[in-house]
Amino acid sequence: MPIVISDTLTGTKRELQPIEPGKIRFYACGPTVYDSAHVGHGRSYVVWDLVVRHLRARGYEVRYVRNFTDVDDKIIRRATERREDPVALAARYAREFDEDMDALGNLRPDVAPKVSEHVPQIVAMISSLVEKGFAYAAANGDVYFSVRAFPDYGRLSKRNLDDLLSGARVEPGEAKRDPLDFALWKAAKPGEPTWDSPWGGGRPGWHIECSAMTLAHLGVPIDLHGGGKDLVFPHHTNEIAQSAAAVGDGRTAESFCRHWMHHGFVEIDSEKMSKSLGNFFTLRDVLAKFDAEGVRLFYLGTHYRNPINYSDAILAEAERRLNYFYETLEKVDALAEGTSPAGEGGGVVEDARRALDDDFNAPQVLAVLAEAFTAANALADKRGKKTPEDRARLAAFARDVREIGTTLGLVQRRPAEALRAIRARAAARRGIDPASVEAKIVERAEARRARDFARSDAIRDALLAQGVALMDGPQGTTWKVE
């Protein structure tokens, strides 16, 4: 079955058609590392991780490049505020970002280039644009792209030049010929990082950075480019223009990239979460409160193109759902131990993959899994001894769920280990000490062995009053935070 995506360039859902059959060259815009990653960044890279995982599961050879913007106005400002070297500041936040992405279960990209390591390639690309007449050097040492020289400008963002001109302005100190033009190279200023160039010392503009790194690590044209909806204009619009002008046909967006995908924002009270608005939560702080896999499940519960509302209550619900998944798997694993799965798989896995083929519809996959978990629990909880066929069906369920979980990045831990971790996070949020709960469970077990059921019930009720529910099963007593 073909994979269909919502392509921002055409404004339609259409089949993903790689330039070279069976291979996908994919570039996702990475973070500007001037601060800790926030919850919105986590959503972005879980989305692209899902895209890469599913494409590979469907047999595509994917080369995934995601950059670090470590040369930028925001980095310079933050370093100045903190009296810190901007290179060191960016390197520290890049390391922290990688740690956060690892915690979320994201695969590392094949290449994670940094702007600071690609300045010669950037200078070469700008030189090519100047030579071809798409860019010009100003007297002050800046270099600008001439927007009107590229006929397909604004197609991605569905904006024409007249609309853009009405909102354009020339900032003080800029030497552009046309308010629509944008900087490819910025002349050196005191206290800023500087590199040599044919136009004098300076540093790259934001947009040219991604174009040069795409060319360096994927070549042009590429098959797929991704980012948040806030990048459609101006960043991706400008990327298309300068890339197609420098190494494409100079006329069409497709000569740089064939397909474009953009995800929705994480919102708080219907407003985009962002550092500039000051309404953000760092990913690191959220991962300290909630199980990382639960946070991943939270992201996957909303289609990537739609906005997703953030709150602690919604995250806690995602964590409870994950707890249910692992409780079911723990129960099923015990019942199906030593049993070969029935059949060769299919149903659940193929239904899930078909949902992902349709514009990476993760919420539909979770709906498929919800039905499978309901059926598995009904079978596992059925009274009476399990038949060999029952155990084989349960084994098949566990196999299939874990198989599709490799694409979602979910349910890959041992259930007992996952449940301990989830309980510990939930308990910590309520000020409950897991060790004291475990001690009470031991005390209750001793009371039950002594047939002191009044004491046993009192312990259970006291824990429940604290928000801890006990569950007795064949494997012993477990607990969860209500």
Swiss-Prot record:
Q: GO cellular-component terms in the record?
A: cytosol
Which reactions is this enzyme annotated as catalysing?
tRNA(Cys) + L-cysteine + ATP = L-cysteinyl-tRNA(Cys) + AMP + diphosphate
Amino acids binding ATP = K275
Entries under SUPFAM superfamilies matching the protein: Anticodon-binding domain of a subclass of class I aminoacyl-tRNA synthetases, Nucleotidylyl transferase
Q: Where in the cell is it found?
A: Cytoplasm
Identify the residue span(s) of motif 'KMSKS' region: 272-276
Q: Which GO terms describe its molecular function?
A: ATP binding; cysteine-tRNA ligase activity; zinc ion binding
Q: 'HIGH' region: where is this motif? A: 31-41
What is the protein's major site of localization?
Answer: cytoplasm
Q: Which GO terms describe its biological process?
A: cysteinyl-tRNA aminoacylation
Keywords of this entry: Aminoacyl-tRNA synthetase, ATP-binding, Cytoplasm, Ligase, Metal-binding, Nucleotide-binding, Protein biosynthesis, Zinc
Q: Which residues bind Zn(2+)?
A: C29, C210, H235, E239
EC numbers: 6.1.1.16
Per its UniProt record, the required cofactor names are: Zn(2+)
Tell me the cofactor note: Binds 1 zinc ion per subunit.
What assembly does the database describe for this protein? Answer: Monomer.
The entry sums up its family as follows: Belongs to the class-I aminoacyl-tRNA synthetase family.
This protein's name:
Cysteine--tRNA ligase
Q: Which organism is it from?
A: Anaeromyxobacter sp. (strain Fw109-5)
Gene that specifies this protein: cysS
